[in-house]
Regions:
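N-terminal secretory/targeting leader peptides
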Residues: 1-13, 32-226
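A gly/proline- and charged-residue-enriched helix-loop-helix capping module
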Residues: 9-31
Length: 226
């Protein structure tokens, strides 16, 4: 759900949702799915972006396009809601799928644009955020339970103190550098900023349903209020 486009306003909002509003719910969800792990916090990995081979003039142009998605419910639901055809492709097969024309574009973490050489197999990367990347920090539950309450607090608090400077700032700096490099390689007009207002209105019902189905009725409204 956290990767769904326009679920959160930005990375700071997404972190607040995960570490405050839904912290207990996320702990319960992790415990249910991964009984050996304890959820601690999130690190902001930066926004996801859309990449396409052909230029979009608006998000309406996504209708009918085959867009790569990971096996993440929020990403798939968002693409379906705007009329795209999400195609689940593992990350290690993504470059080849784009190269061979299996898909028309992709959604993935923006800061991978240069390191993974996606400029070679797509032309356009849009500056609009298309979901927020959050790296979940977890710990072996046995190791966690062996710590005192004070030690547990120190572990979480230390991570949260270091994350803004040692992790998130680096992702913000990298985004500016990466977009500049993309334009250098693919052309000055290859990182458009689209008007997202219509897409946000289209996406809202799907994102609201997803949030309320997973975390209970009224969750989406609470998220928008913080």
């Amino acid at each position: 759900m956290f990767y769904a486009p326009y679920f959160a306003r930005n990375s700071n909002h997404a972190q607040k949702i995960a570490n405050e509003l839904l912290y207990d719910e996320l702990n319960a969800a992790v415990k249910k799915r991964y009984s050996g792990l304890r959820y601690l916090s999130v690190a902001r990995a930066g926004p996801w972006k859309l990449f396409t081979k052909e230029k979009l003039d608006s998000f309406d142009d996504l209708k009918g396009m085959k867009i790569r998605a990971p096996s993440i419910e929020g990403v798939i639901a968002g693409l379906e809601q705007v009329g795209a055809k999400p195609t689940v492709i593992p990350f290690n097969e993504l470059y080849g799928a784009l190269q061979q024309g299996v898909v028309d574009g992709m959604a993935t973490l923006g800061n991978l644009m240069i390191s993974q050489k996606f400029y070679e197999v797509t032309k356009y990367c849009y500056q609009n955020d298309w979901g927020i990347g959050l790296d979940k920090q977890m710990m072996n539950v046995g190791a966690w339970n062996s710590l005192s309450k004070e030690q547990q607090s120190i572990v979480v608090d230390t991570f949260n103190e270091l994350e803004p400077q040692d992790f998130f700032r680096a992702t913000e700096d990298a985004e500016k550098t990466n977009f500049a490099k993309w334009r250098e390689l693919n052309g000055a007009d290859t990182t458009p900023m689209l008007d997202a207002s219509a897409a946000q209105r289209t996406l809202e019902p799907a994102i609201k349903k997803l949030a309320d189905d997973i975390f209970g009725a009224g969750t989406y409204d609470k998220i928008q209020s913080i």
